[in-house]
C-alpha cells in the first residue's frame, strides 16, 4: 500500500510534535522551511529548503508529491501558506479570506466589529506622524497588524511616547502598519478549539501569565484555567460565534481573550492554528487527554477528528525561562521533586539577558500541577 504523503510548513521545535505524530500515524512527512539546522529538518522524511512564505514554490512541490493534506501548528505565517496550498489543491482548509482575517489584526477587528463580537476598539495607523492627531484615551496598546509572539507590542501611558511606539510596531510588522487600540484590563486566557466542516469543538481554556507592561511577553501557562462553569460557558459561546465571524471551518484555532473583574469578555485575537508555547502540542493532551496534534492531522487530511482520550487528564503547566533564577528554580525542582517535571523544551540558557519577545526566550519546562 502506498504511503500517505503529508506536507508540514515549518521546521522549528514548535513543529516537531506535528512531524513526529504524522510519522507515528503512518504518513510520509514532507517539511518545508528555510535551512536553519532546525530539529524538523532532521526529523522529516523529506526536507525542502524553501521559505514558508514562498507559497507558489511550495504549491508546485506539493502538487508534484501528491499530498493528501497540509498543516502546521503554532504559526500565523505558516497558516497563510497552508490555506493557499490547500485551496489550490482542493484539500481541507480555510478560505484565503479567512486566512487574512485570522492573521491580520486590522481585518480581524473590522470583522469582529461588523458581527458584534466583543473586541477592543482600534485605529489603523500607517504613518507615525499621525500620532499627534489621534483622539485616544490612555493607556493604549500599540501593535503591528500582522505579527505574533509578543513582537512589537507596547502599552503606552502618555501621548509623548505614542509616536515612537507606533514606529517600532510598524518596523516589526511585515506590512509596516500598526494598530492603536484601547487597553483592556483583566486576566489573560487562551481557548483551543478544533473545527471540522464548520462545527467547532471546544478542547481547553488556558490561564496565561505574562511579564505585563510594556511588552506582555508570556511567562507561563496553566491548564485547565481555574474558572467557574458559568464563565467557561460564556467563553465557549463568545469564541464559537467569533470563529464563525472569521469563517474558520476546518482545523485548529487559538483564541486569546481577557476577562475583567466584572466578567466582561473581550477577544484580543484569534489565530486559525493551534496555540504555540506548548499549549496545543502538550498542555491540551495532558490536561484533557485529547490528542490535539492528531486531530490537526486528521482534519487536514479530511478525516473526522478522533476524541478518544489517549491519557488520563491531569492539570499541567508550562513555565518559561527568563533568568538565572528560573534556571535555579528548575534545578531545584529536578532535584527535590523530579517526577513533577515532564520535559524541558528548547533550552537555550545563552539567551538570558537577550530576551525581547516570545521567540527568543531561553526555553521552558512542562510540569504536573
Describe the predicted segments one by one:
Residues 130-131, 297-369:
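Peripheral (often C-terminal) accessory segments that flank ATP-dependent C-N-forming ligase machineries
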Residues 1-97, 305, 350, 358-360, ...:
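ATP-binding N-terminal substructure of ATP-dependent carboxylate-amine bond-forming enzymes
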Amino acid at each position: 500500500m502506498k504511503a500517505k504523503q503529508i506536507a508540514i510548513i515549518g521546521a522549528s521545535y514548535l513543529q516537531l510534535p506535528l512531524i513526529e505524530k504524522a510519522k507515528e500515524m503512518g504518513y510520509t512527512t514532507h517539511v518545508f522551511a528555510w535551512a536553519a539546522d532546525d530539529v524538523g529538518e532532521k526529523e522529516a522524511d523529506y526536507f525542502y529548503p524553501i521559505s514558508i512564505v514562498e507559497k507558489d514554490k511550495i504549491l508546485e512541490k506539493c502538487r508534484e508529491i501528491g499530498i493528501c493534506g497540509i498543516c502546521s501548528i503554532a504559526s500565523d505565517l505558516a497558516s497563510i501558506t497552508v490555506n493557499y496550498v490547500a485551496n489550490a489543491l482542493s484539500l481541507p482548509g480555510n478560505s484565503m479570506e479567512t486566512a487574512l482575517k485570522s492573521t491580520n489584526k486590522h481585518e480581524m477587528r473590522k470583522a469582529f466589529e461588523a458581527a458584534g463580537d466583543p473586541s477592543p476598539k482600534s485605529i489603523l495607523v500607517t504613518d507615525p506622524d499621525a500620532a499627534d492627531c489621534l483622539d485616544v484615551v490612555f493607556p493604549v496598546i500599540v501593535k503591528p497588524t500582522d505579527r505574533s509572539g509578543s513582537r512589537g507590542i507596547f502599552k503606552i501611558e502618555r501621548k509623548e511616547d505614542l509616536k515612537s511606539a507606533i514606529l517600532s510596531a510598524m518596523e516589526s510588522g511585515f506590512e509596516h502598519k500598526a494598530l492603536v487600540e484601547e487597553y483592556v484590563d483583566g486576566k489573560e486566557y487562551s481557548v483551543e478549539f478544533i473545527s471540522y466542516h464548520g462545527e467547532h469543538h471546544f478542547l481547553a481554556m488556558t490561564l496565561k501569565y505574562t511579564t505585563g507592561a510594556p511588552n506582555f511577553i508570556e511567562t507561563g501557562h496553566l491548564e485547565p484555567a481555574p474558572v467557574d462553569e458559568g464563565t467557561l460557558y460564556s467563553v465557549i459561546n463568545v469564541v464559537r460565534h467569533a470563529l464563525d465571524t472569521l469563517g474558520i471551518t476546518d482545523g485548529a484555532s487559538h483564541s486569546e481573550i481577557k476577562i475583567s473583574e466584572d466578567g466582561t469578555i473581550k477577544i484580543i485575537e484569534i489565530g486559525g492554528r493551534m496555540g504555540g508555547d506548548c499549549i496545543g502540542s502538550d498542555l491540551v493532551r495532558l490536561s484533557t487527554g485529547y490528542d490535539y496534534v492528531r486531530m490537526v492531522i486528521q482534519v487536514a487530511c479530511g478525516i473526522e477528528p478522533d476524541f478518544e482520550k489517549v491519557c488520563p487528564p491531569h492539570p499541567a503547566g508550562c513555565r518559561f525561562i527568563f533568568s538565572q533564577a528560573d534556571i535555579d528554580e528548575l534545578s531545584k525542582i529536578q532535584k527535590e521533586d523530579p517526577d513533577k517535571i515532564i520535559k524541558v523544551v528548547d533550552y537555550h540558557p545563552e539567551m538570558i539577558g537577550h530576551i525581547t519577545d516570545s521567540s527568543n526566550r531561553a526555553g521552558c519546562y512542562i510540569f504536573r500541577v
